[in-house]
Amino acid sequence: MASEFSKKRKLKDAKIATEDGAATDKKTKKVKKDKKEKKAAEEVVEDATPEEENDAQKAEEQQDGDEVIPTGNGDKEDSDDKDAEAGDELTKTNDSLIAPSIATNATDFSELNLSDKTMKAIAEMGFTKMTEIQRRGIPPLLAGKDVLGAAKTGSGKTLAFLIPAIEMLSSLRFKPRNGTGAIVVTPTRELALQIFGVARELMKNHSQTYGVVIGGANRRAEAEKLGKGVNLLIATPGRLLDHLQNTPFVFKNMRSLIIDEADRILEIGFEDEMRQIIKILPKEDRQTMLFSATQTTKVEDLARISLRPGPLYVNVDEEKQFSTVEGLDQGYVVVDADKRFLLLFSFLKKMQKKKVIVFFSSCNSVKYYSELLQYIDLQVLDLHGKQKQQKRTNTFFEFCNAKQGTLICTDVAARGLDIPAVDWIVQFDPPDDPRDYIHRVGRTARGNNTKGRSLLFLQPNELGFLAHLKAAKVPVVEYDFPKSKILNVQSQLEKLIGQNYYLNQSAKDGYRSYLHAYASHSLRSVFDIHKLDLVKVAKSFGFSTPPRVDITLASSMSRDKKQTSRRAYGSQPKQNRH
């Protein structure tokens, strides 16, 4: 397709998940890259819910067979009697990495007494001033304290936890043979890849190794990398637990555990996995950093079992007037169901020179509207959980690198991802609750002194959601779109769907999934499926009359039941155990 998103572009960043990422110094020989790491990821049907990810991993393990996995004692050039001594030194080193004289009111990175290698990388990334979470979080973390951080997405917390972890690895002179010294646990694969990319930039001048293990990627290649020694490891919970239990690699020297987006990790059902991970990992001399946008009971429980007594609590949001970031203009538009797509189409036509993200409630809706928009010559990228992992990775980095264009997606992209210079966030389908709204709009106006705009589509029967936003301290104003500016292509749309078999089938799937998602909404007092005008809803999918869907079945399905019922492609149902 002819657009800014050139398919011929070589997306170097998209391959980061399959590269070892080790920057070696002059005294260390380079480790050869395993060709298997370049294979495309296994197909995964939905986002990484615990049951699905575990099933997928079991299927991959069966395919791996009885392969001999290397031990985690590392490089051949270091195969001398100093290996054991190095391990002892690591366990005896003082936790404090900075001198007590560092000013706690530092505002510039240059005031932190960081290593020259880290400072050079930070300068090359274009950072000089610290954000509030960095200013308040990095000094105590460098001093070895446990930190419980509360900060909005886009606040700069990735650097806040990576810099202390990298400085620790550098200070202790970690080598591959010393194994894993720091682990970052994050809820989604895309966020793990993004953190990996930031780590790669920060560690370009260091000799320590780094890597990522995520569901949907080649497990065998990951195991081989871990066996060689990965000093900084970024991981999703299910895959990390799998490797901790089944892959021989060195993690006895681990000094730093970082749990990012803890509330989201728990929301999608990884509570049991996190408890097991924390139980397996070494506790002695371990520093833990836990970051969460919201402080729920489950997050407090996780903090209690993972953090040492008396952690430092850093909340950069408690004094803020609003829950969303500054520099973000937020609005909503009231539109009947049958005019929703017409308004979206008109809006995207006008915004083709801007960078726009549009959120939908289901994978099938994303798939259908992506196919439809491209069929009528409005080029978009799409990102959802039914895509292969490699496709999701490529799409994410392609949109990151683009200066303009439209990405339509599900909430797989709504949390934590740092997509540069997004002008508009459009919530075509309503979020599940105000927290999801905040995470979605967090894709724009990220960092200091940045601007962005958001638009929420609401039907007349959904205006009760505004009260929930107000209670969550989210300021929104009503936007008015003149009817004369809305392109009326309804008759052409219905004709197209009636004549094109494949679009027709895709439209039916999208319509069905939209209703099922709507029926499983957590705010059912506001988003009541029985108040929907199905004729008008069907028109937004290009139907003159509604396709048949079992609404009773849909409304009986809860979001949790739907998530836990999903299985990975090719996996088998779990058998009863006696």
UniProtKB/Swiss-Prot annotation:
Protein's name in the database: ATP-dependent RNA helicase has-1
Domain of life: Eukaryota
Gene Ontology biological-process entries: maturation of LSU-rRNA from tricistronic rRNA transcript (SSU-rRNA, 5.8S rRNA, LSU-rRNA); maturation of SSU-rRNA from tricistronic rRNA transcript (SSU-rRNA, 5.8S rRNA, LSU-rRNA); snoRNA release from pre-rRNA
Reactions that this protein is recorded to catalyse: ATP + H2O = ADP + phosphate + H(+)
GO molecular function terms attached to this record: ATP binding; ATP hydrolysis activity; identical protein binding; RNA binding; RNA helicase activity
Organism: Neurospora crassa (strain ATCC 24698 / 74-OR23-1A / CBS 708.71 / DSM 1257 / FGSC 987)
Region feature Disordered, mapped onto this chain: 1-91, 556-578
Extent of motif DEAD box: 260-263
Chain positions recorded as ATP binding sites: A151, K152, T153, G154, S155, G156, K157, T158
Cell compartment(s), UniProt: Nucleus, Nucleolus
UniProt domain comment: The Q motif is unique to and characteristic of the DEAD box family of RNA helicases and controls ATP binding and hydrolysis.
Short name of any one Pfam family annotated for the protein: Helicase_C
EC number: 3.6.4.13
Keyword set includes Zinc: no
Listed Basic residues bias regions: 27-36
Occurrences of domain Helicase ATP-binding (ranges): 138-313
Gene3D superfamilies, alphabetized: P-loop containing nucleotide triphosphate hydrolases
UniProt feature, compositional bias: Basic and acidic residues: 13-26
Function: ATP-dependent RNA helicase involved in 40S ribosomal subunit biogenesis. Required for the processing and cleavage of 35S pre-rRNA at sites A0, A1, and A2, leading to mature 18S rRNA.
Acidic residues: bias regions: 43-54, 77-88
Subunit relationships: Associates in the nucleolus with the 60S and pre-60S ribosomal subunits.
Stated family: Belongs to the DEAD box helicase family. DDX18/HAS1 subfamily.
Placement of sequence motif Q motif: 107-135
Motif (Bipartite nuclear localization signal): 339-355
Key words of the record: ATP-binding, Helicase, Hydrolase, Nucleotide-binding, Nucleus, Ribosome biogenesis, RNA-binding, rRNA processing
